[in-house]
């Protein structure tokens, strides 16, 4: 590969990374605005806002942007924040179930963009309820290995607070609980001196479908297309990617 074309490729990749970083910031800001609108700007009485702000800070969103988002959401700047949460259902390659969660101020735009992304990237839309039943809402808290000596330490800290399960995912321990127990589990971690990276309510698949490399690539292509949409906040799939397939996907990303 010539130096010129390599530079062009590098520049193109950097543009993609910068674009996705900007979109990530915008989505984090939306979460802060909505949390502040629902629960107010006072962090001490709004744990959802605390989580949204913490997540934004960990992703290096500037403090000025965070402060403005809190004030804007709480109505302190005279602006009206009016977002709707809408869930779209569909299937990726080989019947992999997909939920697409949107936070939008224009329902028609969101619907049109999700449908277009689905049809152009090998997915199909599904009727309401036909996919969602495969998932259930759970509180999901990620604790980095660096902040917790062992899985047993994490389990001991959160078991009495309502945690249902602790799983070791290599770099992080994942704690699952009922959404209503999230505050208690977070407090239990803090009391034990254990820091956490993120705490979110997610749609967790009840049954996962193991995928091969070709299917995983197709699913990732569709997920990437969805993540590029401004109105899309979260995407959930029920694919189970084996270690060897994930290694091959990681190699794809490095090329």
From Swiss-Prot:
GO cellular component: cytosol
Keyword terms, alphabetized: Cytoplasm, DNA-binding, Transcription, Transcription regulation
Lineage, uppermost ranks: Bacteria, Bacillati, Actinomycetota, Actinomycetes, Micrococcales
Source species, domain of life: Bacteria
Chief location of this protein within or outside the cell: cytoplasm
Protein name as annotated: Probable transcriptional regulatory protein CMS0715
GO biological process: regulation of DNA-templated transcription
NCBIfam families cross-referenced by the UniProt entry: PRK00110.1, PRK12378.1, YebC/PmpR family DNA-binding transcriptional regulator
Organism: Clavibacter sepedonicus
GO MF term set: DNA binding
Gene3D superfamilies: 1.10.10.200, 3.30.70.980
Family according to the record: Belongs to the TACO1 family.
Compartmental location: Cytoplasm
Transmembrane segments: none
PANTHER family for the chain: TRANSCRIPTIONAL REGULATORY PROTEIN YEBC-RELATED, TRANSLATIONAL ACTIVATOR OF CYTOCHROME C OXIDASE 1
One family name in Pfam for this protein: TACO1_YebC_N
